[in-house]
Design a protein with these regions (language model features):
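Conserved N-terminal phosphate-binding loop of PLP-dependent enzymes in the Aspartate aminotransferase
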Residues: 1-214
């Protein structure tokens, strides 16, 4: 629930919010949405016919909800037991924002596929899918893209990755995120329901609509 994975046909099918889906149906059949951080619901939803479980380790569009370690580790176990792939969507969380290069590293879990984009090339449009050894049938030439491997985007990505490593942007995000949360908690406002997040990906949930605060 609350998942947002994109606006193209496949990713939109896995996106929960109806406002994005309306006008584009029918979408891909066989997609089920499961309550986030609910291991029991995930156990019931995944079976031997399930191709993959796709999730965000921190739901961004859904309200900055981090997954529990138990949930992510259970997802890995369930996928292994039932022959499904574990796909982690790191479009928003990847490349240091949460205090590690990839948010899934906080959970000591290795996904089968990891999607990344946005900050990958420092704002220049670029996306990538990282695959592990369980994805055996995806070989060079199986998938193609008109704009794939764009030289400008690749050069921008190389430069951005150099800066991330040389300036330790993940470490900076961890330190600054901890500082931000510490200061936010000191506000102690009766209007704040919850402060949550991971690294520098932090959300403040208010008890009323936020229109009046922005």
């Amino acid at each position: 629930m609350r998942a947002f994975h994109g606006r193209t046909y496949g990713s939109l099918s896995a996106t929960f919010n109806k406002k994005y889906r309306e006008g584009f149906e029918p979408l891909l059949p066989g997609v089920s949405h499961v309550s986030y951080n609910n291991i029991e619901a995930l156990e019931k939803a995944v079976n031997e016919e399930t191709a993959a479980v796709i999730l965000e380790v921190v739901q961004g569009e859904g309200g900055v909800y981090p997954a529990s370690a138990e949930y992510i580790q259970a997802a890995r176990r369930i996928c292994d037991e039932r022959g499904a792939l574990l796909i982690v969507d790191e479009i928003q969380t990847g490349f240091g924002r949460t205090g590690k290069m990839f948010a899934v590293q906080h959970y000591n879990v290795t996904p089968d596929l990891l999607t990344c984009a946005k900050s990958l090339a420092g704002g220049v449009p670029m996306g990538a899918v990282l695959i592990g050894p369980n994805v055996k049938n995806l070989t060079p030439g199986v998938h193609g893209s008109t704009f794939g491997g764009n030289p400008l985007s690749c050069a921008a990505a190389n430069a951005a990755l150099d800066v991330m490593r040389e300036e330790d942007l993940p470490g900076q995000a961890a330190a600054k995120g901890a500082y931000l949360v510490e200061k936010l908690k000191k506000i102690e406002s009766p209007n704040i329901r919850e402060i949550r997040g991971l690294g520098l990906m932090v959300g403040v949930e208010m008890k009323q609509k936020v229109t009046g605060y922005i």
